[in-house]
């Protein structure tokens, strides 16, 4: 379908988690009459059950709306929804590249938050026109003037005529549409130049194969044409193209300036990478669009089936999830304690939790997940350097020259009352203070350099609980730094449990070890014999707790009488327990593995 380009508007909606981004998208869809109120399921763009339940957008979607504006022209609005969570920053940056404008939602009750700011910087990097919108004005605690002041002071945008809306109640939605029509620039692009298009999303369809969402910058895509993916150099033939509106609507072509989907019998999402450039096989462009990067996992953890024979089912399930999620990686690994399993790589903690939940929900699998870890660079004395994802493979202390760990630059926005507790939390997590800026008399931004290893465990939860949910966090990886790290091993009944091994900083080793053994003592059920729970560094035990045994009262039948008879029975019982301990095995429940992650809750 061809439109006059001057009536096309490509925009996305950016916001902090929970500021009402998907709800506003729904109201825009309703207002333009694409779906009736009856057809609307809450959050149309969030199609995964999990997305709706957690109220977050994980994968982004693109949808075409037709809006008749007050000037009586019909405008074509391409709305590209973006995930707001820090784990998915790369996906946000790609979808912004497909737009000319961004609607920035600011919550009237909370003002500008850390990830709002993070996303604004991404939009500024892409030279987008930013249109602020104040949402949630229906709430009793809404303060529109406060939100306007924050938009002007913190982001530096003029907030005089900013639309104030309630996406939930559908108040003032037309103002947002008019704002988009007036202020978002029309796309530029030449249909006669060679094809140049950006992939900003892809998903797997069981009938069509991989469906790729693209923004065409130059040229056009038609069924039958042969296209080339520039990062992988693979070619495919286009079988269908079109756009998403109330459903998938196929068209004759997608031309320069427009957004749509392309089907070309691709079997694996890895061949259609987000951020890649598509061009014509017979008439390619010289260089791809800039900004493409291979997404690399930041957090790793082991996933094991609770029942050993389910290993293949878990692997198949992960393969199916990977088809839709190019950022998920996995490889086989074995553990003495848990048997066969898979070492999986994720973008961050939220990404990890979502994959684990989907394994449970969509595939009904019972899994055990080990503590997450990051990639360490170990420089050995013989001059070699190795990368360690699994703490079990950490070399002996005698072989190590020095170790480097990944560090992040964290930005925390918080009300001024909580500055003290946040600084205390960051110092406790081995943070280095960088800078503190007062945004106004009530709010402050604190910048810290933190080891990623500390952020992935429970930093986010601790931050939220210490600040009653008011603080918000944004972080980015800045590189590797030297650190005194050691391997802490946990022994249960004198046997090392490799799945509980973690890498800790030397100064925190004793404290962590104490907390972990105390946690495990509470989580592991009592057996018929005494179970020692120990934490060791190398051959040195640094902490121990004992799980007491159940005891049968062997003296119940003895009334009075000779002490030697009682002693004999007790000795016999002791002997039996000793024998039992040497042959008995200890069942470690999944809760015990999880408790290691939440070691900070003990204090």
Swiss-Prot record:
GO biological process, one term: positive regulation of translation
Membrane topology: Peripheral membrane protein
Family affiliation: Belongs to the TRAFAC class translation factor GTPase superfamily. Classic translation factor GTPase family. LepA subfamily.
PANTHER family in the record: TRANSLATION FACTOR GUF1 HOMOLOG, CHLOROPLASTIC (PTHR43512:SF4), TRANSLATION FACTOR GUF1-RELATED (PTHR43512)
Domain of life: Bacteria
Gene behind the chain: lepA
Transmembrane segments: none
This enzyme's EC code(s): 3.6.5.n1
Cell location: Cell membrane
Stated role: Required for accurate and efficient protein synthesis under certain stress conditions. May act as a fidelity factor of the translation reaction, by catalyzing a one-codon backward translocation of tRNAs on improperly translocated ribosomes. Back-translocation proceeds from a post-translocation (POST) complex to a pre-translocation (PRE) complex, thus giving elongation factor G a second chance to translocate the tRNAs correctly. Binds to ribosomes in a GTP-dependent manner.
The entry's keywords: Cell membrane, GTP-binding, Hydrolase, Membrane, Nucleotide-binding, Protein biosynthesis
Start and end residues of each tr-type G domain: 6-188
Known catalytic reactions: GTP + H2O = GDP + phosphate + H(+)
NCBIfam families given in the database record: lepA, small_GTP
Protein name, per record: Elongation factor 4
Residues binding GTP: 18-23, 135-138
S-S bonds: none
Species of the source: Finegoldia magna (strain ATCC 29328 / DSM 20472 / WAL 2508) (Peptostreptococcus magnus)
CC annotations in GO: plasma membrane
Record InterPro entries: EF-4, EFG_III/V, EFG_V-like, EFTu-like_2, G_TR_CS, LepA_C_sf, LepA_CTD, LepA_IV
GO MF terms, alphabetically ordered: GTP binding; GTPase activity; ribosome binding; translation elongation factor activity
Xref: Pfam families: EFG_C, GTP_EFTU, GTP_EFTU_D2, LepA_C
Keyword Membrane in record: yes
């Amino acid at each position: 379908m061809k439109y006059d380009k001057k009536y096309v508007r490509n925009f996305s909606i950016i916001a902090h988690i929970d500021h009402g981004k998907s709800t506003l998208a729904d109201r825009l869809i309703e207002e333009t009459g694409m779906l009736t109120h009856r057809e609307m399921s809450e959050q149309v763009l969030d199609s995964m059950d999990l997305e709706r339940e957690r109220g977050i957008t994980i994968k982004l979607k693109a949808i075409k709306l037709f809006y008749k504006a007050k000037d009586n022209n019909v405008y074509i609005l391409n709305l590209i929804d973006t995930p707001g969570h820090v784990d998915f920053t790369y996906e946000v940056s790609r979808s912004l590249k497909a737009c000319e404008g961004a609607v920035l939602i600011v919550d009237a009750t909370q003002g500008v938050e850390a990830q709002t700011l993070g996303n604004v910087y991404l939009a500024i990097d892409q030279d987008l026109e930013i249109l602020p919108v104040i949402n949630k004005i229906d709430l009793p605690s809404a303060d529109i003037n406060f939100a306007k002041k924050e938009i002007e002071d913190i982001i530096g945008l003029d907030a005089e005529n900013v639309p104030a809306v309630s996406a939930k109640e559908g108040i003032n939605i037309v103002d947002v549409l008019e704002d988009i029509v007036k202020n978002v620039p029309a796309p530029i692009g030449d249909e006669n130049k060679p094809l140049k298009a950006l992939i900003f999303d892809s998903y797997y369809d069981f009938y069509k194969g991989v469906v790729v969402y693209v923004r065409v910058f130059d040229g056009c895509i038609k069924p039958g044409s042969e296209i080339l993916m520039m990062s992988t150099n693979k070619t495919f033939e286009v079988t269908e193209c079109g756009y998403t509106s109330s459903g998938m609507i196929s068209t004759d072509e997608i031309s320069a300036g427009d957004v749509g989907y392309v089907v070309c019998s691709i079997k694996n999402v890895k061949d259609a990478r987000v951020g890649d450039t598509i061009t014509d096989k017979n008439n390619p462009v010289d260089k791809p669009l800039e900004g493409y990067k291979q997404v690399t996992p930041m957090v790793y953890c082991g996933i094991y089936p609770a029942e050993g024979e389910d290993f293949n089912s878990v692997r198949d399930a992960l393969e199916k999830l990977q088809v839709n999620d190019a950022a998920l990686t996995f490889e086989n690994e074995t553990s003495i304690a848990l048997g066969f399993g898979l070492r999986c790589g994720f973008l961050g903690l939220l990404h990890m939790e979502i994959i684990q939940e989907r394994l449970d929900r969509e595939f009904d699998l019972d899994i055990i997940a080990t503590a997450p870890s990051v990639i360490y660079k170990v420089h050995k004395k013989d001059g070699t350097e190795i990368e360690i994802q699994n703490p079990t493979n950490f070399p002996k202390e005698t072989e190590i020259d020095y170790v480097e760990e990944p560090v992040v630059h964290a930005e925390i926005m918080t009300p001024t009352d909580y500055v003290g507790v946040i600084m205390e939390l960051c110092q406790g997590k081995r943070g280095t203070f960088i800078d503190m800026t007062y945004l106004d008399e009530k709010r402050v931004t604190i910048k810290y350099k933190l080891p990623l290893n500390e952020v992935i465990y429970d930093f986010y939860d601790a931050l939220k609980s210490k600040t009653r949910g008011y603080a918000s966090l944004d972080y980015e990886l800045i590189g590797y730094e030297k650190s005194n790290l050691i391997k802490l091993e946990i022994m249960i009944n004198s046997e090392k449990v490799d799945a509980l091994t973690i890498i800790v900083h030397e100064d925190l080793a004793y404290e962590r070890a104490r907390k972990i053994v105390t946690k495990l003592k509470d989580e592991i059920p009592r057996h018929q014999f005494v179970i020692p729970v120990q934490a060791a560094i190398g051959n040195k035990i640094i902490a121990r707790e004992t799980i007491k045994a159940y005891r049968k009262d062997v003296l119940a039948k003895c009334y009075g009488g000779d002490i030697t008879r009682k002693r004999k029975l007790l000795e016999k019982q002791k002997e039996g327990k000793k024998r039992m301990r040497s042959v008995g095995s200890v069942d470690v429940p999944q809760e015990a593995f999880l408790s290691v992650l939440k070691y900070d809750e003990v204090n």
